[in-house]
């Protein structure tokens, strides 16, 4: 192992000088430095640039407090490597693969894999046309997810991305029964803690590996923790031949961490101050999240949209990699419609008659047509009132409002806040319910009966309780 000395520390970026003639560490290699003689505190650095004359620029994976010039730095000779395999299930890791769940640490000889790898080649890839049922009406009807596909949940601050991803974990991980990997990237530690204890109580933790690099951690950790979670998922896919669910909350923080260190690494910022390598970094991560002939990875990624601006380079770059997009809309939260999924902006490659069937496709497109027409009529209603509409449009508006409310439902994970039990609605029930609303079967029921309910039978029961 070659060794060098710290030449400069600027926040999370550390320059390390190696003696001329020594072999320089390769890009992405992990370097180790101890802050005291007893070697009680270890800091891991990752090589990002070679500056020439034996100096490399590195990004710290932990806080650089305690580092001083002249400290010895050792080259490990390989990238950061993390534990993989069945032993990772039920455990919680940080970016370096160290356990953080207060239970027994992993043995030094446990199987490990480097976090930097190449994406699968074209001939290894496979595509699926099997629908992944989520039990959430608005998703299953209008923007269905594919098994082995990539899903993005887009939304601004506080519109319900994390609650939706937790409900998907609750519904899919429990129904699916396979292996799940949850990766928390730059989000709140409290949410990760809540999720861990909920999973422990429900028993899902036994089939889940969790990896966290939260908001309070340096940008190096937030930039690489997604790769740690992905490496664990890839092992289950490639070696064990499993179908894996990969949840990532939040992909935007991965980009944000990259932009934090980009200027310190000496790169010129590009649009909106992001790193010039934004598209490359996103591509390298996303191309590894894929399904191969050995096994599948179904990934569900929350993506924060800064200031609700979908043209921002970070969410715009992520769009290109996804099969399905679920867009959360602030206006719907203001109307009290949860989940606040925009039925017209959300889209899916799976919404075609060949994949979902003729009936489902016909109902979904008619629902979208009715909602689109309602949106067009809203300006007229705001200026002239409902009376100026034709009878046909009045009926359409009444049905559109019922559809809009029926797209909401109670979540299991929100039961402690709402006091209402959550509901899981099978796809067939969802399609039947919306078909009957479109046919006018429930035109006589009040709009409020359609709010936050499960299947259409719940609407009828609610209306009955209201005296209809």
Swiss-Prot record:
Binding site for ATP: 155-162
PROSITE patterns: ATPASE_ALPHA_BETA
Keywords: ATP synthesis, ATP-binding, Cell membrane, CF(1), Hydrogen ion transport, Ion transport, Membrane, Nucleotide-binding, Translocase, Transport
Pfam families the UniProt entry points to: ATP-synt_ab, ATP-synt_ab_N, ATP-synt_VA_C
Chief place of localization: membrane
This protein's record includes keyword Translocase: yes
Reactions catalysed: ATP + H2O + 4 H(+)(in) = ADP + phosphate + 5 H(+)(out)
Top-level enzyme category: translocase
CDD domains xref list: ATP-synt_F1_beta_C, ATP-synt_F1_beta_N, F1-ATPase_beta_CD
Membrane topology: Peripheral membrane protein
Molecular functions per Gene Ontology: ATP binding; ATP hydrolysis activity; proton-transporting ATP synthase activity, rotational mechanism
EC assignment: 7.1.2.2
Assembly notes: F-type ATPases have 2 components, CF(1) - the catalytic core - and CF(0) - the membrane proton channel. CF(1) has five subunits: alpha(3), beta(3), gamma(1), delta(1), epsilon(1). CF(0) has three main subunits: a(1), b(2) and c(9-12). The alpha and beta chains form an alternating ring which encloses part of the gamma chain. CF(1) is attached to CF(0) by a central stalk formed by the gamma and epsilon chains, while a peripheral stalk is formed by the delta and b chains.
NCBIfam families per the UniProt record, alphabetical: atpD
Protein name per the record: ATP synthase subunit beta
């Amino acid at each position: 192992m070659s060794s060098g000395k710290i030449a400069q520390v600027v926040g999370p970026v550390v320059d390390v000088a190696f003696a001329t003639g020594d072999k320089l560490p390769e890009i992405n290699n992990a370097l180790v430095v101890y802050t005291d003689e007893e070697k009680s505190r270890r800091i891991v650095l990752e090589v990002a640039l070679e500056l020439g004359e034996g100096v490399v620029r590195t990004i710290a994976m932990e806080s650089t407090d305690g580092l001083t010039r002249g400290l010895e730095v050792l080259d490990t000779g390989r990238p950061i490597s993390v534990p993989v395999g069945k032993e990772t299930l039920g455990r919680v890791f940080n970016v370096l693969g160290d356990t953080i769940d207060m239970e027994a640490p992993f043995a030094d000889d446990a199987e490990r894999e480097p976090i930097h790898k190449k994406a699968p080649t074209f001939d290894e890839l496979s595509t699926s046309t099997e629908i992944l049922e989520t039990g959430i009406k608005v998703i299953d009807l209008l923007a269905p997810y594919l098994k082995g596909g990539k899903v993005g949940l887009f939304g601004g601050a506080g519109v319900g991305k994390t609650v939706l991803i937790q409900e998907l974990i609750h519904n899919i991980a429990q129904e699916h029964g396979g292996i799940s990997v949850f990766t928390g990237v730059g989000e709140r530690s409290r949410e990760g803690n809540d999720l861990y204890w909920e999973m422990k109580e429900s028993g899902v933790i036994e089939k889940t590996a969790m990896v966290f690099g939260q908001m309070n951690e340096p940008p190096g950790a937030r930039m690489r923790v997604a790769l740690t979670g992905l490496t664990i998922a890839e092992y289950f896919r490639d070696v064990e031949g499993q179908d894996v669910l990969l949840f990532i909350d939040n992909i935007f923080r991965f980009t944000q961490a990259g932009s934090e260190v980009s200027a310190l690494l000496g790169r010129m910022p590009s649009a909106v101050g992001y790193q010039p390598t934004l598209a490359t970094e996103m591509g390298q991560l996303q191309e590894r999240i894929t399904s191969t002939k050995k096994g599948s990875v179904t990934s569900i990624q929350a993506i924060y949209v800064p200031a609700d601006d979908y043209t921002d380079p970070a969410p715009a770059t992520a769009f290109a990699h996804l099969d399905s997009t679920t867009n959360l809309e602030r206006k719907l939260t203001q109307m009290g419609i949860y989940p606040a999924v925009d039925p017209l902006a959300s889209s899916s490659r799976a919404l075609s008659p060949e994949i979902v069937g003729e009936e489902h496709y016909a109902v979904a497109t008619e629902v979208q047509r009715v909602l689109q027409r309602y949106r067009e009529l809203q300006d007229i209603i705001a200026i002239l009132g409902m009376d100026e509409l034709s009878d046909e449009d009045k009926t359409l508006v009444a049905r559109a409002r019922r559809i809009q409310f029926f797209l909401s439902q109670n979540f299991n994970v929100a039961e402690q806040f709402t006091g209402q039990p959550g509901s899981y609605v099978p796809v067939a029930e969802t399609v039947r319910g919306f078909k009957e609303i479109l046919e006018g079967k429930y035109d006589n029921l009040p709009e409020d009966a359609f709010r936050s309910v499960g299947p259409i039978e719940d609407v009828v029961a609610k209306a009955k309780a209201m005296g209809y």
